[in-house]
Amino acid sequence: MRRSTAAALTVTLVATGLTPLFLAAPASAAVAKHYDDFNGDGYRDLAYSHYYSGISGDDGWTGGAVNIVYGSASGLDTTHTQVVHQDSPGIPGTGEEDDYFGESISSADLNKDGYADLIVGNGTEHVGSAQYRGTVTIVWGSRTGLSGGTTLAPKSGASGSQSHFGSELATGDFNGDGSPDLAVIGGSETWLYRGPFTKSGTTGGVSKIDKVGQGWYSHGLAAGKVNGDGKTDLVVLGTQFVDNRPASRVWYLKGASSGLTSGASKTYASEPWSAAIGDFDKNGYGDIAVGLPDNNDGRGIVSVWHGTSSGPSGSMTYNQASSGVPGSLEAGDNFGYSVSAGDTNGDGYADLAVGVPQEDVAGKEDQGGVTVFRGGSGGLTGTRSTWIPQTVIGPADSYVSFGSPVRLRDLDRDGRADLTVGANGDALFMRGTSTTPTATGSVHLPEYGGGFLD
């Protein structure tokens, strides 16, 4: 079994051009209701990257890009799209062959003007003599959509060669002051940039979550509300070296007025690859789902850390041998390669989508698929879980790696989270229903090659 390169993170659509025009926000503007509503129309928009390739064709370019499909009352509006790259008007930098613009993407209304902004990481960007230093670009939302950009300055410790600044991003109001903040991985450490942000490049205070002194190296982030205090909490995936031995760990950081404070941590036998936060038992506390696809010779598991008022405590483990879960345990399936939480059927309980991108089906190697677990009063259950096969995106084939990334978000405001699934060179948007996400009326997102918004 092989692992899809496209899945290592987190269109043949007509792309509208970007303009460098900045629209002034009204003085009374508040933070956008949805962190991914770039034009302020009340509907969530979908952004996805193809960071290791450019637009197809002889006159194309390389260096990575992010595509945006704007939302509407009927779902994604494929006639209203946009593409952002470093050669777009108003976007800093220049697209270069080994750039990974879109390696990570996140969003929030960073300048509090009522429009969500797109944050794009490019961890391989060369800056001056600093090779692979990396950059983070904020592309500003407006009434007409995304327009113009500002580069975020890294601090010492994430500004040298091989820092890969921007390799992972996460947003949230971590100190509860009403201004969205931004967490960035650079130099194998996590940096917290406090809001508000301005188009001239200023931010609030910047602090380092310094665990390198304890042998900790960060490689993944997930943000959400765990302990019910209203502040956003942060989950960091990484490796800690103890007595020169690596240990795979997940670290929960509690949101606080001072920023982020130390919380619980958990050690795993294999590397944590993905994480999502959702209230699977509807008790008011967010549960942390961690995907560990390499566990047990690549059969994979998902570990769910239960949320409480004091943070995560106790856990349950799920795999393809769990009661009611479709499929069977097979080496190399990579169950848990991607995870995302959302209420797909509108019952008030968060559900969990789990990508199984290297699942073999009927002799087709690495065909892939997605399992959707149902939330309930007792938390996640395999009972009533559903399997979404690769054939919803196209004919059965090998090496499609369907499920390499997954994302659950309600884009049409019907109270049910819609499912977007990535594969090798393609992605599919499916509507949530009272039973399970459906391929009826689905939307293809070709030119995909990277990840989705968190």
Positions of predicted regions on the chain:
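Hydrophobic strand positions within the blades of repeat-based beta-sheet folds
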Residues: 46-48, 66-69, 84, 101, ...
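Beta-propeller blade termini
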Residues: 30-44, 49, 102-115, 166-174, ...
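Beta-rich catalytic cores
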Residues: 42, 62, 97-101, 106, ...
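Short glycine/acidic-enriched loop and turn motifs that connect beta-strands
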Residues: 51-58, 124-129, 189, 239-244, ...
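A detector of repeated loop/turn-to-beta-strand junctions in beta-rich toroidal repeat architectures
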Residues: 60-66, 78, 117, 131-135, ...
